[in-house]
């Protein structure tokens, strides 16, 4: 099906086109029908509770839905492996003729992370005459000035240009500032503003540029960089101010875009810069590896990566300029969107029919929250953008491989079925169901972690199985909170210099904890009413004993591994790391 659709599309020449397959309505019907049938089949398998495997002696059973999820994980892992192997075998050339603008979005960044970011950008291995470096700071007050000073220090001796802009591209003039008889419009770019002319002149004539502008959010900052660049470069690279680039990060992404004119964007492998700050940051480092090298690698096999990550991504500039205004003015339920900037950029590329890729050869290291509350706020924000962008992405399924439709449906319904399964088991009235649920969660996580160990060649990935508890107790309820507050754009992130004070995401966790505790209490109470002297209950008691011992032993072993392997050995080793390419893949 992918090949048929591809045959109907033309390779872009000059101005990029919106690549529609022939008979788009027919393809839409086919893809949407497939999605509906897939959803109905999975739902029917879940509701029917058909048992594929059942063993009364050990109280074990595997339903059709569980088997389907196992097959999904196996397929995803297989395609990820094939993609990584393909990339490893390929030796793509680089012409070093394409011009690149490396754009950095910054907002009250931790000076320690910012200096690492700027220095890594300075030493990126790409011809200086082909590379621009642009830092746009979201804020123009005295509290933001330190970022510009650091930029000047790092790029001292280079072709540097700086400008403190009192406004931004969408500053609204006050009535007294407007000429008599004119009518100011809300959020209308001030094309005649001298600040705009100054910014664009600096960006197009200087190699290293730093702009401080009126606060407007990350999307406003990114818009300034993209708009000021105009058509002066071939590719635009995005980067966050807390990200440290590998020396080859830029050139490896350029290679991918040069290899095929149908590739509209490419993302790289984002690792964690501060994995040993806390348990949260360490688990995030393992989760990031899985997200990029399994999930996005699988999507890249089918040329449909769903999100080019903000810390490390690259876009064809001629495509980006086509949808720049539409991207900036995105609305959802009548409200301007301030979250999900990177995911919507990716979706805009996909909406035009261009392919999106991932390469693990391009690498960067980004800061992640080390405190639980800040991490939870981050995950809630990402989940909001996921649900919103899912609706947008569904409009363009017919332009890409059918895998995109399949994965979109499966990933969307997964948390709802997991929630239903948990509630159904803990309120079944038997303690064994609760223990079996806990065992199943960790067994499945352990199998996935073992595969990751093999794929990465590092036993540290065994600890990835611990992430399942973070998901079940934190991420799962936060998904419902994100869904219910989808149109609330004010609850976002803050600069690294500030402490997150948004405690709202704790509310769904409290409700979820009450539901779980209520279910466990109900099952214990109901089981205590039964006669445990019967042969069936005696056998169940043995299973309960073995299950509980096994579960406790698992956590003891994992806790010891984490404490000895990570907290002591790896942290000491990480303190000797000074250069980005010296940062170990993970301590062994």
From Swiss-Prot:
The name this protein carries in UniProt is Hyaluronan synthase 1
Q: Which UniProt keywords apply?
A: Glycosyltransferase, Membrane, Transferase, Transmembrane, Transmembrane helix
Q: Name one GO molecular function term.
A: hyaluronan synthase activity
Q: Set out the biological process GO terms recorded for this chain's protein.
A: extracellular matrix assembly; hyaluronan biosynthetic process; polysaccharide biosynthetic process
Extracellular side, ranges: 50-61, 433, 478-505, 565-588
Provide the topology term for how it sits in the membrane.
Multi-pass membrane protein
The EC code for this enzyme is 2.4.1.212
Question: Mind telling me which Gene3D superfamilies this protein's record contains?
Answer: Spore Coat Polysaccharide Biosynthesis Protein SpsA, Chain A (3.90.550.10)
PANTHER family under this entry?
HYALURONAN SYNTHASE, HYALURONAN SYNTHASE 1
Which species is this record about? Answer: Xenopus laevis (African clawed frog)
